[in-house]
């Protein structure tokens, strides 16, 4: 049982951050908060407005990476959330309450747990929450990217939304993708390469890890995601080009071939990358320069 030493209201008045620590200890240790202590939390919650956002963020992050991250619900039930930030307070409304479903299988890493907590938010809303709490720019970028892509089907696999709305339908959808994987592997790999090209390798790995955790309640969907993980490994093992840096030609090559320096160089390289994502065999300097030359002549 979590309780204060002495009078709870006095302890929380001395340092309002203790109200968040009480909830964090509850999540870390699995203990319940004693009734009088909880009542004092509700009463002293407005004092949290006087605590620096950095200190508030540290407690919320520790809560989210705890063994019981879903206990962040208590931050809302005790009336603390309005005193964190307006956008933070609205997260349950935006998500329909699903923000409190944070599978313990999601790795206890700051960016992953924050992303899962805010996965129903728009990326810009997630950024507002994290900036208000003074999180570092790298974490904000990682969370924003994950929030943007968690709800997207990469290659036709069921998303968390489709699983929640129609689990049987999601299982059927997963079955179709499984057949596609066995018959049209190249088409699926093209889609996966495109998705991989949109973010850093580590972030893409985090995205698949999170998607897999959120698909656990639908085994066929989870099986599809494991198959996509295997395809990802195959793409990397084969050295398939998935970024501008991996292209066999560079901007300098295009300029030497006669193209004027400027935005057009970047545009052409992006067009070439799209062709190579479809078929990695095309990624040779000779082929790509001849292709660009024929386009210029036309």
Q: Residues of each region from the PLM?
A:
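A residue-level signal for conserved active-site and pocket-lining positions in enzyme catalytic cores
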Residues: 15, 20-23, 74-75, 147, ...
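Charged substrate- and nucleic-acid-binding regions of tRNA-handling and nucleotidyl-transfer enzymes
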Residues: 1-5, 24, 207, 213-298
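Double-stranded RNA-binding/processing signature
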Residues: 46
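Short, well-structured alpha-helical segments
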Residues: 38, 42, 72, 89, ...
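Conserved, hydrophobic alpha-helical core segments of structured domains
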Residues: 49-220
